[in-house]
UniProtKB/Swiss-Prot annotation:
Domain remarks in the Swiss-Prot or TrEMBL record: Each of the four internal repeats contains five hydrophobic transmembrane segments (S1, S2, S3, S5, S6) and one positively charged transmembrane segment (S4). S4 segments probably represent the voltage-sensor and are characterized by a series of positively charged amino acids at every third position.
Cytoplasmic-side positions: 33-51, 156-159
Residues modified by glycosylation: 13
IV repeats: 1-159
Cross-referenced PANTHER family: VOLTAGE-DEPENDENT CALCIUM CHANNEL TYPE A SUBUNIT ALPHA-1, VOLTAGE-DEPENDENT N-TYPE CALCIUM CHANNEL SUBUNIT ALPHA-1B
Catalytic reactions of this protein: Ca(2+)(in) = Ca(2+)(out)
Descriptive protein name: Voltage-dependent N-type calcium channel subunit alpha-1B
Length: 159
């Protein structure tokens, strides 16, 4: 009946009234005691969320500073994983590289590009192949371990 009336040119389309179906959920929440408790627990868990986010930010900050000091002088090469978009030259680029590594995108290739005897940036003042470090193994594996297994699980546990 409503669609028949709405199809005529004189009336406004009344299909927006379907939005009021969502009001049934509010009525359901008022009646269900267990659903209210579950929702209250979910809201209360958000109080600990800023602390977990702060801990993750602190981990990224520490690893970005260490990465800039140890791997910041590696020459940029488009054929390796250390290129103009993916490097430790500045703090923001180091954070982006760490975020990319934390998501699991080719972190092992980045690690292998940071090993010792890599070419140095000409502006760094270092000789040709003394950049990089074998510390890259410990650096990247520990970062992936902390991000993937500890921080992500802690974040999910709070929610």
């Amino acid at each position: 009946l409503v669609t028949e009336i709405a199809d005529t040119d004189n009336f406004i389309n009344l299909s927006f009234l379907r939005l009021f179906r969502a009001a049934r959920l509010i009525k359901l929440l008022r009646q269900g005691y267990t659903i209210r408790i579950l929702l209250w627990t979910f809201v209360q868990s958000f109080k600990a969320l800023p602390y977990v986010c702060l801990l993750i930010a602190m981990l990224f900050f520490i690893y970005a500073i260490i990465g800039m000091q140890v791997f910041g002088n590696i020459a940029l090469n488009d054929e390796t994983s250390i290129n103009r978009h993916n490097n430790f030259r500045t703090f923001l680029q180091a954070l982006m590289l760490l975020f990319r590594s934390a998501t699991g995108e080719a972190w092992h290739e980045i690690m292998l590009s940071c090993l010792s005897n890599r070419a140095c940036d000409p502006l760094s003042g270092l000789t040709k192949n003394e950049c990089g470090s074998d510390f890259a193994y410990f650096y990247f594996v520990s970062f992936i371990f902390l991000c993937s297994f500890l921080m992500l699980n802690l974040f999910v546990a709070v929610i």
